[in-house]
Amino acid sequence: MSKQATLFDFSIKKNESKEQTNQESVEVPKQTANRTKIEWIKEAEDGKVYFLLQVDYDGKKSRAVCKLYDKEGKKIYIMQDESGHKPYFLTDIDPDKVNKITKVVRDPSFDHLELINKVDPYTGKKIRLTKIVVKDPLAVRRMRSSLPKAYEAHIKYYNNYVYDNGLIPGLIYKVNKGKLTQLNPELKGEEINEIKKAFADADEMTKETVNDWIPILETEVPDIKRVSLDIEVYTPNRGRIPDPERAEFPIISVALAGNDGSKIVLALKREDVNSDFSKKDGVQVEIFDSEKKLLARLFEIIREYPMLLTFNGDDFDIPYIYFRALRLNFSPEEVPLDVVSGEGKFLAGIHIDLYKFFFNRAVRIYAFEGKYSEYSLDAVATALLGISKVKLDTFISFLDIDKLIEYNLRDAEITLKLTTFNNNLVLKLMVLLARISKLGLEELTRTEVSTWIKNLYYWEHRKRNWLIPLKEEILVRSNQVKTAAVIKGKKYKGAVVIDPPAGVYFNVVVLDFASLYPSIIKNWNISYETIDIDECTKKVWVEDETGEKLHYVCMDKPGITAVITGLIRDFRVKVYKKKAKYSNISEEQRSLYDVVQRAMKVFINATYGVFGAENFPLYAPAVAESVTAIGRYIITTTYKQAEKLNLKVIYGDTDSLFLYNPTKDKLEELIKFVKQNFNLDLEVDKSYKYVAFSGLKKNYFGVYPDGKTEIKGMLAKKRNTPEFIKKEFAEIKNMLASLNSPNDIPEVKNKLEIKIKDIYNKLRNKGYNLDDLAFRIMLSKPLDSYTKNTPQHVKAGLQLRAFGVNVLPRDVIMFVKVKSKDGVKPIQLAKISEIDIEKYVETLRTTFEQILKAFGISWDEIVSTISIDSFFGSKK
């Protein structure tokens, strides 16, 4: 069941809260771990070839299990580890001393100790460590606190298994007696030469790594057989989302859409609605007089698919089906679904919750260029597919069967299409990201980019037999920072920003340093094990824009962060961005290359942010400070050079410069200067017809020659801005887009003043309805978990709960600002007469004042003239 733009689409009545009392006595079905009677997935055949989708841990058999996809048979299989691989962690204490730690050696899960050699990432020398081997992963968690130092003790077991065996999810493997052998694609000579040419000047460590990465980027991505699932549940009250764990209300419809062309709707026959339905081409509708029969049929269908897709299935569809099945007296062994640690599991394959994938900030911004700003199925599908959900004018429980089928099926179709549009772009993207991060598909799609990058670097450490250092050890070596932070909460000085003047500037060209921070990391060999290292013969100082020496970088050996970051950057820029534009290859191949470069863009752009985050395990303050310092030095030096060339820089931020009316030859000179002095690519990123600057940083309104606009930092673009402001801003945006020359400014200023006056008066006269005035904010966690302070949308949510509405995390709460103790009311409980006009006037001001300043218009002057006009108008 996908979420609408808001949970509360219909008004509620106070007496409906009575139902809340009734539901409290409902017993929650008990979950059980006894799932042994049915083997949902067959064993892989020896000698056959499969795609590795992910690795799990089977607690009953105490071994790793690989989930494998057979491209030809379109089925999923498992391969259980036969090598005897066990969980473990490391310590620098000798075995004889470890043997004296009773909490370790007397733990029932303790297995044995081993002496092993690892490579110190700082010195490159071998170090001796004790390997503590245990019988189950939970033992690592128990034991690690009993040792002064426990290395590699916070890694999930199945990821450890992947590292130790050098596995890469998403690649092709041959099964051989409980082991997997990687099979690489055969490339033509010219393809290999093209890649080698791109890395001709690289160090040996990078060249070796390039060879390992070719299969990651060149291996085909299978069109995995998959089916999307969406359920609809009867609820007696409007505005209520059923509790999945209670699962007290019947599932009235289940829609499935498969990439094999199947479209199936399973609906429950009910006496309270019209059960007639019209036949639709290609749609298989099955009506059931029993909900249990409906679910049995559902389980039969989904077992035929290796991959199950949902949108918000972790939080709703999967747990609701699972607990509802238990309530209907299915035994757990009959249900191919489970709920583990808040995740919906598909025991007959793998389950991808697309909501969590599209919710990922790095995916939204870097892979899809911010095309969607809200995360509901409707918002994402409208932005990426141009398709929306079926609009309803009544409550789902009141729909006749025919309309219910249409509504439910549309959701399932949209969910599937999110993985099939543009030649399976999203599926391919997920597989490529899995290959790069070395994460299985289920974990990849449920975690943030910081987890992806951490896993990639851990895998690369293990491949080189490097010890993964403790976070505390990294901080001891590189915790010293030399610059003071400008932004509160930061530990060091960040990027340089050249303050913009307030005003309108025509013919503005934006120059962008391509992948500035990743390029700095690569070109300056920056990595946690190369900064401020005593054991070094070749040191290069990092200087900031003032000339102060902050840190030194060791150039004796390539740093792992520099190697991996540079490799991904160069693969993208020098190889795959070009390949994605080749005309002499198939559309399918070109599509794959485009996905490859998109996937790498995600990693490139997220790298610095992750390594500069304090909660990242490889975080080194000196590394982050060095990167930003070099960035400031480059921007400042380039700015000074631009001035020497008589180029007028009107704004600069982090990795870009805005130039006013530059000449082509001077631009080329500046680009050449940057290449020669820093070995960086300075590119023309965009050209504006004009830019209106408010005078604030990261805050401007740009218009392109074709009339399209770009808004940066202005409140009207924010997701939770009231609808009336968005609508009025859109009209003003169209008005401003028509501005073609400085001569047009007086006329546009006059229109702008008149428009603002009209909006102001309409607001004062209560001409906007509650929907127009509503703020929309998503609830990120349960209402009761807000203990320190209570945000406005939470206050509104608490009011709704008092009226019997079940408010859950990820629900979008609509509220208005009113004159009351809380200052807000949910839209369902508010009246237009209660609206606090002054608060909305302030919101109006903070939104439009930014635009007004750019045109030299004073908000206070506009309001004062309105007041004077009103005064004299009342005298007539």
Swiss-Prot record:
Keywords recorded for this protein, A-Z: DNA replication, DNA-binding, DNA-directed DNA polymerase, Exonuclease, Hydrolase, Nuclease, Nucleotidyltransferase, Transferase
Catalyses which reaction(s): DNA(n) + a 2'-deoxyribonucleoside 5'-triphosphate = DNA(n+1) + diphosphate
Pfam families recorded: DNA_pol_B, DNA_pol_B_exo1
Gene3D superfamilies, A to Z: 1.10.287.1390, DNA Polymerase, chain B, domain 1, Helix hairpin bin, Palm domain of DNA polymerase, Ribonuclease H-like superfamily/Ribonuclease H
Coiled-coil stretches noted in the UniProt entry, renumbered to this chain: none
Nucleotidyltransferase as UniProt keyword: yes
EC number(s) given by UniProt: 2.7.7.7
Keyword Cell membrane in annotation: no
GO biological process: DNA-templated DNA replication
Alphabetized GO MF terms: DNA binding; DNA-directed DNA polymerase activity; exonuclease activity; nucleotide binding
Similarity comment: Belongs to the DNA polymerase type-B family.
Entry function: This polymerase possesses two enzymatic activities: DNA synthesis (polymerase) and an exonucleolytic activity that degrades single-stranded DNA in the 3'- to 5'-direction.
Name of the protein this chain belongs to: DNA polymerase 1
Encoding gene per record: dpo1
